[in-house]
Amino acid sequence: MAAWRPPRVEELLAEARRAFMEEFGAEPELAVSAPGRVNLIGEHTDYNQGLVLPMALELVTVMVGSPRTDGLVSLLTTSKDADEPQRLQFPLPSAQWSLEPGIPQWANYVKGVIQHYPASPLVGFSAVVVSSVPLGGGLSSSASLEVATYTFIQQLCPDSGAIAARAQVCQRAEHSFAGVPCGIMDQLIALLGQKGYALLIDCRSLETSLVPLSDPKLAVLITNSNVRHSLGSSEYPVRRRQCEEVAQALGKESLREVRMEELEAGRELMSKEGFRRARHVVSEIRRTAQAAAAMSRGDYKAFGRLMVESHYSLRDDYEVSCPELDQLVEAALSVPGVYGSRMTGGGFGGCTVTLLEASVAPLVIDHIQEQYSGTATFYLSQAADGAQVLSL
């Protein structure tokens, strides 16, 4: 089986323009895109003020549209996986009236960004959303839509905020309109991604540094398990709370401030489960710093070893893996030429990410498909650019 080739931005843009013309009877005036992402290492560390190392993908959300004069927002998505209805209309928020989350869920990400957008006056608009980022696959379709929405509104009502402030608006939208207490990684990489680079993000200071990832002999393979265990949505807030409780027990603001020796010394202050959760986070922050350094010096073997350690820690200490993800990782690791593999994203399903020699990619894909009990989807990606304004 070959890796899936996602549609290029130009193809998505053409689809969006056609849909806009059909729905609204005119050509759109504006177009933007924002990418999904894969996190190479640094899982469940962002909401602990830790380090993460994502890269933007060539999978993107495209938004096209035009301003309106009646104070309404009219939306349509072409995504088959989005919940119904695929179109809706609502008035802009005002001093007297705030937007509220509702049905369909996909539109809540758009509503949240509109509600929290920092500049004024807001202008109504009609827009069509088209995306190649799979929903629920752990590749951040939500942040992709939030950042596309923010970038679109910027064209109608320019803001003066720094990029970190824009990411925080999108993060707040997800907290308050989707009910997900996410960290800030997904929004930052969607804004700041650069072709040929991963991005090391310090989620405490919001400082970022580019890590070269453009060796043509190297490939990043994303494997979607195509399973989504319902545990994911309920367990995410539990993990976050457990981390906060351990930090509090140790008198720290977050687990970022905790060294492994301090955690070991304070074992009696927390539950066995809390200790394991914190051990994952503290060790994962250290692994992420080491991995960024390894990638910068071209030491792919060291990077791969750290990926594998990360997976085992997520499986055993953080307990967010599942049999399907474990199967995919073990299958990948059994092929020569694979440097490392791990689950990526929140867990309980979704995707794995594998670093490998580009030449063995077809072999790895065939082997995983043979070994995997389910039906996986494969996607080979280069590190891509962040949000863009597209010309029409």
UniProtKB/Swiss-Prot annotation:
Binding, alpha-D-galactose: R37, E43, H44, D46, D186, Y236
GO molecular function, one term: ATP binding
GO biological process, one term: galactitol metabolic process
Binding residues for ATP: G136, G138, S140, S141
Enzyme Commission (EC) number: 2.7.1.6
Keywords: ATP-binding, Carbohydrate metabolism, Galactose metabolism, Kinase, Nucleotide-binding, Phosphoprotein, Transferase
Catalytic residue list: D186 (proton acceptor)
Modification Phosphoserine occurs at: S230
PROSITE patterns: GALACTOKINASE, GHMP_KINASES_ATP
InterPro entries assigned: Galactokinase (IPR000705), Galactokinase_CS (IPR019741), GalKase_N (IPR019539), GHMP_kinase_C_dom (IPR013750), GHMP_kinase_C_sf (IPR036554), GHMP_kinase_N_dom (IPR006204), GHMP_knse_ATP-bd_CS (IPR006203), Mevalonate/galactokinase (IPR006206)
SUPFAM superfamilies per the UniProt record, alphabetical: GHMP Kinase, C-terminal domain (SSF55060), Ribosomal protein S5 domain 2-like (SSF54211)
GO cellular component terms attached to this protein's record: cytoplasm
Protein's pathway: Carbohydrate metabolism; galactose metabolism
Catalytic activity: alpha-D-galactose + ATP = alpha-D-galactose 1-phosphate + ADP + H(+)
Marked site positions, Transition state stabilizer: R37
Enzyme class: transferase
Quaternary structure (record): Homodimer.
Function: Catalyzes the transfer of a phosphate from ATP to alpha-D-galactose and participates in the first committed step in the catabolism of galactose.
PANTHER family xref list: GALACTOKINASE-RELATED (PTHR10457:SF7), MEVALONATE KINASE/GALACTOKINASE (PTHR10457)
Family label: Belongs to the GHMP kinase family. GalK subfamily.
Entry protein name: Galactokinase
Originating organism: Mus musculus
Encoding gene (name): Galk1
